[in-house]
């Protein structure tokens, strides 16, 4: 049996196959569609001919007894197809363990109440509509879970014991929920599951959370007549489908605790399912097969707790999970983009887990046309030259951050059926392989921190926290700074201590022991900490202890919200901040009353008009900044970075990722560009095969979408890496 592991080397997660450190570059061929398997087989063959020997296939695992053998047969067919063309192939098996369609409907017949049900399917009398439309078994069903775990164990055991296939499967990618990605099925369109199975799960969750203590339950919920058997999902659900209105931003009242506990369940249930399936794979394979899953899409999903993706810390700390995955961020991925990650990527690396980038960037190739084909809305690459520049950008990012990737023909259409594409991928794979022993972890000077447990208390992220997460992420990627993304727990644990500037996206939970831990980070010498929007239910003393400033709340009149709009003042007068002027309404607003060093901006409208919404406090060797809006734009972020003394590596707007040994750059707009290095050093311009000796910057005039990989340090040491000479782009 082949053995595969993810292990740290120089602090970086590395893929080992049979004890050989291997560049983690895969090709995913979509094996879901029988009528396109001939295309996928051609792509497998072409990839192997160009030196790619890591592959991924996909299938739906049937959990019912009568479905199990067909699932085994399907994977066997896919492996046979692949091994015909590459006897050395090593395979990542992507397998969906959930139950859909006819299988789910059949399950419902014997297990009523275990299909996903949406809030809109509930009648006024509390009963489910007879004609409710659902196509998935609820992930809250315990009977389904047990059956799926048994099926997965039998499935994995078959291939572990197979005389041929056991030598080729190196990883299982456990998928479920919507599109394998562990979102709650249809949550963006229909909302969250309120089925009988979900109701039962919530009662069990609440009982466990409060230790079965009725007194604790009643104190938390503010009801002295409440018992555990009375617990049910409270409807309407704040933020369901992302847009349900709710009078306040933060859920802090006793009568709102049921919503908080339900939001928590939505994520912890998904995490616990993944952990259970991962444990099975590790046990059956004796720990010698890699396990990964889709999870942690905090930024792409706009901070929405209804997604189920906010129990990431549980999975980061799970010894049975080796890695995580997501597609490249969809909204900034093409030529001139940054290819942003959806997750707290630097926490992943800090836990020595590997992030697998699903590189499903659409190419301009199709093997054959089909009825109904239209231009893909996410496609923006129409020639080899542009495609290569994006591939080089992605490869550089992955090398610096220790990530794996699979190049993905999402639907088996022949996106990769051209030898020139495989030549390029093979050259990048050889480069990655040569750098593996030499790269050390990325060292951010700016830390972006999100507390996932506090996301459970956000009534609706749409139009508020979504700006903080989704929008600001893309701005952070374009600042020309060394920016890292972390979980709140990892920040408190010291995993972001290299940063001199920290953005706390939702500091509402920094109370008690957590607050004391935060103070140790905030009060470090040379540290600047930025608090975004507000402080939940903290009192004045708690807010002042964190920030050094006196802050207060401005509550909106009943049935209304307050607009977040500011005008700049003092030394910042005249600044133009489009983001702060965005039409965002929220309740409450927070403002600074006193004990500040400098005010930067004041609110301009409504009850908060004239009150300070943006200010700084210089303290004994450190400084704090409060910003009462939800999104800081590029100019303000750079102003703050300069106040903090953060090193700037280049022009704002371009993508620049500066690692300890190498830097990747990709231009957003044409023009003269200067990149700065952390010190005077020798620089190898890899794609140009050119050396610059003893420099601290390089200036070039460039077109849009040009990628450069700079490797820096001592020329003698870098030449000792024995890097393959870049042969130039194939076409």
Residue positions per predicted region:
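The substrate-binding groove and active-site-proximal loops of carbohydrate-active enzymes
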Residues: 23-34, 57-72, 130-150, 254-272, ...
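Short acidic, Pro/Gly- and aromatic-enriched capping/linker segments at domain boundaries
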Residues: 1-14, 198-205, 597-613
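N-terminal carbohydrate-binding accessory modules
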Residues: 1-47, 437
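A short, well-structured beta->alpha microelement
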Residues: 38, 312-315, 475-495
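Hydrophobic targeting/anchoring helices
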Residues: 287, 292-471, 555-589, 600-615, ...
């Amino acid at each position: 049996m082949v053995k595969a592991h993810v292990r740290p080397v120089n602090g970086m997660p590395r893929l080992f196959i049979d004890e050989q450190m291997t560049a983690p570059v895969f090709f995913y061929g979509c094996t879901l569609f029988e009528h396109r398997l001939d295309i996928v087989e051609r792509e497998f063959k072409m990839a192997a001919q160009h030196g790619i020997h890591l592959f991924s296939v996909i299938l739906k695992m049937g959990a019912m007894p009568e479905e199990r053998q067909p699932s085994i047969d399907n994977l066997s067919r896919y492996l046979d197809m692949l091994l015909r063309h590459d006897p050395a192939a090593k395979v990542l098996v992507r397998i969906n363990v959930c139950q859909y369609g006819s299988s789910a409907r059949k399950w419902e017949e014997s297990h009523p109440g275990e299909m996903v049900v949406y809030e809109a399917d509930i009648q006024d009398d509390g009963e489910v509509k007879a004609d409710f439309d659902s196509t998935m078994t609820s992930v809250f069903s315990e009977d389904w879970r047990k059956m799926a775990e048994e099926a997965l164990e039998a499935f994995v055991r078959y291939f572990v014991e197979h005389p041929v296939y056991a030598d080729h499967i190196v990883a299982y990618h456990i998928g479920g929920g919507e599109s394998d990605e562990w979102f709650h099925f249809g949550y963006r369109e229909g909302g969250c599951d309120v089925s009988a199975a979900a109701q039962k799960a919530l009662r069990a969750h609440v009982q466990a959370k409060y230790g079965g203590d009725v007194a604790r339950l009643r104190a938390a919920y503010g009801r002295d007549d409440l018992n555990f058997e009375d617990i049910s999902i409270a409807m309407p659900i704040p933020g369901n489908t992302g847009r349900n209105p709710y009078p306040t931003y933060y859920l802090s009242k006793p009568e709102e605790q049921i919503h908080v506990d339900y939001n928590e369940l939505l994520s912890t249930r998904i995490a616990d399912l993944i952990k259970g399936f991962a444990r099975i794979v590790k046990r059956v394979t004796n720990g010698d097969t890699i396990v990964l899953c889709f999870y942690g899409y905090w930024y792409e999903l706009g901070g929405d707790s209804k997604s189920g993706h906010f129990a990431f810390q549980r999975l980061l700390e799970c010894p049975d999970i080796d890695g995580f995955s997501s597609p490249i961020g969809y909204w900034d991925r093409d030529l001139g983009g940054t290819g942003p990650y959806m997750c707290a990527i630097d926490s992943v690396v800090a836990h020595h887990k590997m992030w697998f980038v699903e590189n499903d960037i659409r190419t301009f190739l199709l093997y054959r046309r089909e009825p109904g084909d239209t231009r893909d809305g996410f496609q923006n690459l129409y020639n080899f030259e542009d495609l290569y520049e994006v591939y080089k950008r992605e490869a550089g990012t992955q090398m610096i951050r220790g990530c794996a990737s699979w190049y993905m023909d999402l639907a088996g259409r022949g996106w990769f059926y051209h030898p020139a594409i495989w030549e390029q991928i093979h050259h990048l794979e050889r480069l990655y392989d040569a750098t593996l022993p030499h790269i050390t972890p990325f060292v951010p000077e700016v830390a972006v921190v999100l507390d996932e447990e506090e996301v459970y208390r956000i009534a609706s992220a749409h139009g508020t926290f979504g700006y903080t997460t989704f929008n600001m992420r893309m701005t952070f990627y374009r600042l020309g700074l060394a920016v890292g993304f972390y979980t709140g727990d990892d920040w408190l644990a010291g995993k972001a201590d290299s940063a001199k500037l920290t953005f706390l996206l939702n500091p509402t939970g920094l109370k008690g022991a957590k607050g004391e831990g935060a103070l140790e980070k905030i009060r470090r010498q040379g540290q600047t900490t930025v608090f975004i929007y507000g402080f939940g239910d903290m009192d004045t003393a708690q807010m002042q202890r964190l920030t050094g400033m006196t802050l207060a709340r401005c509550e909106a009149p009943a049935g209304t919200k307050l607009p977040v709009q500011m005008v700049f003042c003092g030394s910042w007068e005249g600044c133009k901040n489009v983001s702060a002027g965005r039409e965002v309404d929220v309740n409450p607003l927070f403002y600074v009353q006193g004990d500040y060093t400098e005010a930067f901006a004041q609110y301009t409208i409504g009850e908060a008009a004239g009150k300070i919404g943006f200010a700084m406090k210089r303290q004994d060797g450190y400084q704090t900044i409060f910003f009462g809006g939800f999104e800081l734009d590029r100019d303000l972020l750079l102003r703050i970075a300069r106040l903090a003394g953060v090193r700037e590596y280049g022009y704002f707007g371009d993508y620049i990722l500066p690692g300890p040994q190498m830097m990747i750059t990709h231009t957003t707009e044409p023009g003269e560009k200067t990149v700065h290095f952390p010190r005077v050093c020798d620089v190898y311009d890899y794609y140009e095969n050119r050396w610059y000796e003893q420099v601290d910057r390089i200036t070039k005039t460039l077109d849009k979408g040009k990628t450069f990989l700079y490797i820096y340090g001592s020329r003698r040491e870098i030449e000792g890496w024995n890097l393959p000479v870049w042969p130039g782009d194939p076409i």
